[in-house]
Structure formats: C-alpha cells, structure tokens
Amino acid sequence: MDPAMPLQLWNLPLLLVGSVLGLTSVSAQGNNLEICLLPLDAGPCQALIPKFYYDRDQQKCRRFNYGGCLGNANNFHSRDLCQQTCGSIEKVPPVCRSELKTYPCDKPNIRFFFNLNTMTCEPLRPGLCSRTINVFSEEATCKGLCEPRKHIPSFCSSPKDEGLCSANVTRFYFNSRNKTCETFTYTGCGGNENNFYYLDACHRACVKGWKKPKRWKIGDFLPRFWKHLS
C-alpha cells in the first residue's frame, strides 16, 4: 500500500465491487427463492456499507453491514428492494423452518422433512435419522403443516412490470404481497404475464386460488408428532 494514498481511495474498489454485487442480486428476479434463502454473508472486507438481506428464519428483510467485497446475492440496497424481491415468498410455521440435523441410524422406517429451499416435503435419505422438530413420521402431516397452499398460476407471483414503451394504458396485476388485484399503467409493450385487461380476469386467475382451506395448525397433530420422537 502506498502510504501517501488516502485510506478512502484504497476502500473505493471495495465500494464499487459491493455496488456491483448489489445490482446482481436485484436483477436475478427469476431466481428469487434461491437468492432469498442464501445465508447472511457480509464478505471478508472491512467496509461498513448499510445493506439489507432476507432472513430465512425470521422471514423478513433485515439490515446488515456489508464489508464491500464478495458475499452473495442476498444483498439489497434498500429494505423496499429486498421486500420486492423476497416479500412474496410464502411464509411457513417456525417448526418447518428448523434446520435439519441428521445422524446415521439403521431404522428402516421412512420419515419426512420440510426442505425450505424447495418448499416441499422430502424423505430423509436411507440410513439417516433426526431428532429435530422439522421431521415427520407421515408425509401427509408434513405437507399439511408446511407446504405452501399454491393454487394459482406462477405468473401471479411476478412483479408489476410496466413494459418498455411510452403508452399509458390502464391494466390490472396481482399484488402477491397484498393478495389483491390492483391497477397500474402499462406502456404498451414488453412486461410479463401478470397483466390483465379486466379486474375480474385478474381476480379469477389469481385471487380465488388463495381462498382455500387454511393450512393445518400444529395442535392438530402435536400428540402424534411428539410420539414418534420418543
């Protein structure tokens, strides 16, 4: 390091790298779930840049100090941007978010756990057991408690996209955070499939799917669940 060069200039490349990483996380709209479930990673450098990340355990966006280099894509310039990218991820009960810890065993019976990365219930590999609460003796129990109730087309979760042109056309889109259809101004070209001519069409495609029976409550299966842990 040149002693004559101010410390701020040495930190400048770190700030630039941090900005690039932040932009990368924002542009990856197609992989929101993968990005948002990445663990907090402030990076190895020493800058203190205020950023936001999605906390998969608390299921909300939280502030952290980014070091300025490396890290991962779960790194947003603002809370609003974090919410736009990750806020529509389906919430699941705390029991389903518990980290899976396994150990070798010779029990032949199949058990199931909720994989937060895939948002599905999956069988434990043969020869593995677990005492964590995110393990269920029956697949139906796991699915009933943990798996998101999604009965709507995937495009209903797409963000509002006004398009690329300059027209001013009133359209409707499904706001996945509020679970309602709302108006927006469409510019006439580009955009995505979350774009409806009529409010009723948006409602039929995206709103009705959310009005299904509620997910099971933990009390519905707790005695049987604890029995299999003993």
Swiss-Prot record:
Glycosylation sites: 168, 178
Keyword Glycoprotein assigned: yes
Domain spans labelled BPTI/Kunitz inhibitor: 36-86, 96-146, 156-206
Compartments, as annotated in UniProt: Secreted
Disulfide cross-links: 36-86, 45-69, 61-82, 96-146, 105-129, 121-142, 156-206, 165-189, 181-202
Keyword annotations of the record: Blood coagulation, Disulfide bond, Glycoprotein, Hemostasis, Protease inhibitor, Repeat, Secreted, Serine protease inhibitor, Signal
Matching Pfam families: Kunitz_BPTI (PF00014)
Extent of the signal sequence: 1-22
PROSITE patterns: BPTI_KUNITZ_1, BPTI_KUNITZ_2
Top-rank lineage group of the source organism: Eukaryota
Gene3D superfamilies noted in UniProt: Pancreatic trypsin inhibitor Kunitz domain (4.10.410.10)
Site, as annotated: Reactive bond: 46-47, 106-107, 166-167
CC terms in the record's Gene Ontology section: extracellular region
A single BP term in Gene Ontology: blood coagulation
Record GO terms (molecular function): serine-type endopeptidase inhibitor activity
First-listed, main subcellular location of the protein, grouped into a coarse class: secreted
Database matches in InterPro entries: Kunitz_BPTI, Kunitz_BPTI_sf, Prtase_inh_Kunz-CS, TFPI-like, TFPI/VKTCI-like
Tissues where this protein is expressed: Highly expressed in placenta. Also expressed in liver and kidney.
Domain notes: This inhibitor contains three inhibitory domains.
Function of the protein: May play a role in the regulation of plasmin-mediated matrix remodeling. Inhibits trypsin, plasmin, factor VIIa/tissue factor and weakly factor Xa. Has no effect on thrombin.
Subunit note: Finds in a complex with ABCB1, TFPI2 and PPP2R3C; leading to the dephosphorylation of ABCB1.
Name under which the protein is recorded: Tissue factor pathway inhibitor 2
Organism for this UniProt entry: Mus musculus (Mouse)
Taxonomic lineage of the native organism: Eukaryota, Metazoa, Chordata, Craniata, Vertebrata
